[in-house]
């Protein structure tokens, strides 16, 4: 497997830290040892996050093609679009963002705070579109690309989550390689990795990266799309494409893609009581914030797996914190009392 042959444009600080979650582990009985890898602290570009790691492999292609405008898509409180806007500003490029109405939620300031506020401050051309949630290619995004061409620009297309893109899985192959190097320093290997999944390339890259040492099925995706069949298909497809691209010396099988469907409800972007309890518990035991759309759901999943005895006693579990905290501001009413 060879990731080094792909050009990478540095946008992150370097390897992200691994932090023991000692108080949360103790609160949950102390039989499972929890850790977090802090992708939410990976960059100085507008709070960073998992998409910034992915963009390191997309940006060299955009520059090589002479593109002048990054064009991406997400929901109103999209972390993806905020990170694309930050990278565009950092590189001196233009940025067009399609922000669809992916979440059935109304807060008085939902479309004026958090991620979308930062994207506007960063200078992006933010275009609100009423279309609902879907992780596939969108007509609104195609229209935005065409509008840039019609104005004489040269757009670079970045799909939702950087996912359905030939290079979208590479960043998290690198994540797995980074974890292996950190494990060598720590003196132990993690038994499981827990990660939130929606558009698929984060988990897909991890599956490929950890397949190299036989741990593909130890990556536990926690679905937050509430459309798990579509998410599972996309993870599997991206993983297979990425495996071929990096020269993994085995096929990706369906059994390699583990996706837990229990924690996504009631629907994309809306937390349930378990999500909210997990957000508060993590914050109050570790001082680590998670959001209601993504990380709160994967945190809920990990907590319940520990409570239910789904990890063998003594397991070391690595929680991949992908970012997303700026979206908390869009849910101010839910958290009005903390």
UniProtKB/Swiss-Prot annotation:
Give the InterPro entries listed for this entry: ACCD_DCysDesulf, ACP_carboxylate_deaminase, ACP_carboxylate_deaminase_bac, TrpB-like_PALP, TrpB-like_PALP_sf
- UniProt EC number: 3.5.99.7
Its family remark reads: Belongs to the ACC deaminase/D-cysteine desulfhydrase family.
- Name its species: Pseudomonas sp. (strain ACP)
User: What are the disulfide bonds?
Assistant: none
| SUPFAM superfamilies associated with the record | Tryptophan synthase beta subunit-like PLP-dependent enzymes (SSF53686)
Which UniProt key words apply to this protein? Hydrolase, Pyridoxal phosphate
Q: Kindly provide the name given to this protein in its UniProt entry.
A: 1-aminocyclopropane-1-carboxylate deaminase
Q: Does the keyword Coiled coil apply?
A: no
Superkingdom per UniProt: Bacteria
GO molecular function terms attached to this record: 1-aminocyclopropane-1-carboxylate deaminase activity; D-cysteine desulfhydrase activity; pyridoxal phosphate binding
* Modification N6-(pyridoxal phosphate)lysine, positions: 51
Question: Which reaction is the catalytic activity of this chain?
Answer: 1-aminocyclopropane-1-carboxylate + H2O = 2-oxobutanoate + NH4(+)
EC category = hydrolase
The active site consists of 78
Note the subunit structure: Homotrimer.
């Amino acid at each position: 497997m060879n990731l080094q042959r792909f050009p990478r444009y540095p946008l992150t600080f370097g390897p992200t830290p691994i932090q023991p979650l000692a108080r949360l582990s103790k609160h949950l009985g102390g039989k499972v040892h929890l850790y977090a890898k802090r992708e939410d602290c990976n960059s100085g570009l507008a709070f960073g996050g998992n998409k910034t790691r992915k963009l390191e492999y997309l940006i060299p292609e955009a520059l090589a093609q002479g593109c002048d405008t990054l064009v991406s898509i997400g929901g109103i409180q999209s972390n993806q679009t905020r990170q694309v806007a930050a990278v565009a500003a950092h590189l001196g490029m233009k940025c067009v963002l399609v922000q669809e109405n992916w979440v059935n939620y109304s807060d008085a300031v939902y479309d004026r705070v958090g991620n979308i506020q930062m994207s506007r401050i960063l200078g992006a051309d933010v275009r609100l579109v009423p279309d609902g949630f879907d992780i596939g290619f969108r007509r609104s995004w195609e229209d935005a690309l065409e509008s840039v061409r019609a104005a004489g620009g040269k757009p670079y297309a970045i799909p939702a989550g950087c996912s359905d893109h030939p290079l979208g899985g590479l960043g998290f192959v690198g994540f797995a390689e980074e974890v292996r190097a950190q494990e060598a320093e720590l003196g132990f290997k993690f038994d499981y990795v827990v990660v939130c999944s929606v558009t698929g390339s984060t988990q897909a890259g991890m599956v490929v990266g950890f397949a190299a040492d036989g741990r593909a099925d130890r990556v536990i995706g926690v679905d937050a799309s509430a459309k798990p069949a579509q998410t599972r298909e996309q993870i599997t497809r991206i993983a297979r494409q990425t495996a071929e691209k990096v020269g993994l010396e085995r096929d990706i099988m369906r059994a390699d893609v583990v996706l837990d469907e229990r924690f996504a409800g009631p629907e994309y972007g809306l937390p349930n009581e378990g999500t909210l309890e997990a957000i508060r518990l993590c914050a109050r035991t570790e001082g680590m914030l998670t959001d209601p759309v993504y990380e709160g759901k994967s945190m809920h999943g990990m907590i319940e797996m520990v409570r239910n005895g789904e990890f063998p006693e003594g397991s070391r579990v690595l929680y991949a914190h992908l970012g997303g905290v700026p979206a908390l501001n869009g849910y101010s009413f839910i958290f009005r009392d903390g």
